[in-house]
Amino acid sequence: MAAKDVKFSRDARERILRGVDILADAVKVTLGPKGRNVVIDKSFGAPRITKDGVTVAKEIELKDKFENIGAQLVREVASKTNDLAGDGTTTATVLAQAIVREGLKSVAAGMNPMDLKRGIDLAVTKVVENLKARSKPVAGSNEVAQVGIISANGDKEVGEKIAEAMDKVGKEGVITVEEAKGLEFELDVVEGMQFDRGYLSPYFITNPEKMQVELTDPYILIHEKKLSNLQSILPILEAVVQSGRPLLIIAEDIEGEALATLVVNKLRGGLKVAAVKAPGFGDRRKAMLEDIAILTNGELISEDLGIKLENVTIGMLGTAKRVTIDKDNTTIVDGAGAADAIKGRVEAIRKQIEITTSDYDREKLQERLAKLAGGVAVIKVGGATEVEVKERKDRVDDALHATRAAVEEGIVPGGGTALLYATKALDGLKGANDDQTRGIDIIRRAISAPVKQIAQNAGQDGAVVAGNLLRENDETKGFNAATDVYENLVAAGVIDPTKVVRTALQDAASVAGLLITTEATIAELPEDKAPAMPGGGMGGMGGMGGMDF
């Protein structure tokens, strides 16, 4: 075990604060519409240019182990805010720095750190209540676009594309961001349910130009197990042929003989048919097949449910208006499922999302939810160079998370004013003792930091701007850093998602509280490297040639 270095009280706290300041000072220059870029050197490839707080924070590693502890804890604030709200990482970092600075000053003045933390927690609870009370639900796609524009640093095209995507796939729909080949933004929307399984044989193709299978008004047979021969489904195949409608078979697999028979029947024109493998694996596959059954008003043919293939009737098959299959994906559009049944299934999946502890499971459940409730939209981000594409993609990701947060918990006026005006919620609030009251004052001061930093990045005096706003006492009014004007921020489209502001404050206060109550820090001592062997050959060996043997 390597030897450790231990620092105590004032020495420990000063080192931690230095680390906090280094990271926060690098991150906070990106805040607001006039925030600056940060260039990050890479060990390979071109440097990365970004205005994304969490990206900057993740790149910072300090040489001094004790300073690094402070930097890493603030980095944790940015990461946690990013995970929970997807945006607001720079605001969270600015708040954490402000709380730590004020808190450590108070500790140095002899106040009790535990009481300070209790006061901080009390004040944060009050501010969060105030934010929730002032929050307004998002009204229409125009406000969704505005949230996106603000989060993407004033990029109008980004906000509008996200609003359009949300319009098309709904609040539950999946929106993903990819890099495009060209220069422009593109939006691809997949209607209906899509899963990543293509046709089992190219002989099923009905549209050779697009290399796709297109089935109109098909029956859909959903089978949990493998199909190795068609003997058991001959009665149902005959019934489908007589109906004159196409058939889609979804099964775990369709093996040699069964597949060959289907292909021959398709080529002879007797049966319009296509077959695909079931999506997913294990229990997830069964759940996805049940989703498809509910969406298409069919039944999952499963021995667990006591249904055998021989007993399947045409009434057990699902139907849809259209099915499109290419070599990679199958898309079912306009399934005949009952709205109530689909709604019930959506609610069941939502409950599973709430109780699951695995991020992977949550992501897969959300995908299933989107496929049932909405659709899938892909925003493709273009640019002239790889560096530009990556920077724009960062902004689109931020904007997308911010708009989702806005839809979830509503919006408050932006530009840091929501927190600034929340200081009124702390008027008259007292702790159980003077130290707790000082903790409340720390939050009162800290929540004005984002407004001051946004103004400072715009070339204004932050303290003057914050003072002007508090003097005016008009909660709708704020400082629009993009135009250097005091105005109604909601009317001007400068709005923040309540969830982002709330999460930023809670995460910042949580980690700052831990730092304030730290009395000792432990870090590994750097190892002394052994001196290298001297270079050159072994001297004095040249005379060995004269030895007698």
Curated annotation (Swiss-Prot):
Function: Together with its co-chaperonin GroES, plays an essential role in assisting protein folding. The GroEL-GroES system forms a nano-cage that allows encapsulation of the non-native substrate proteins and provides a physical environment optimized to promote and accelerate protein folding.
Protein's recorded name: Chaperonin GroEL
This enzyme's EC code(s): 5.6.1.7
Lineage: Bacteria, Pseudomonadati, Pseudomonadota, Alphaproteobacteria, Sphingomonadales
Pfam family, one: Cpn60_TCP1
Subcellular location: Cytoplasm
Gene (UniProt): groEL
Biological process (GO), any one: protein refolding
Catalytic activity: ATP + H2O + a folded polypeptide = ADP + phosphate + an unfolded polypeptide
Annotated residues for binding of ATP: 30-33, 51, 87-91, 415, 480-482, 496
Similarity remark: Belongs to the chaperonin (HSP60) family.
UniProt organism field: Rhizorhabdus wittichii (strain DSM 6014 / CCUG 31198 / JCM 15750 / NBRC 105917 / EY 4224 / RW1) (Sphingomonas wittichii)
Enzyme class: isomerase
Domain of life: Bacteria
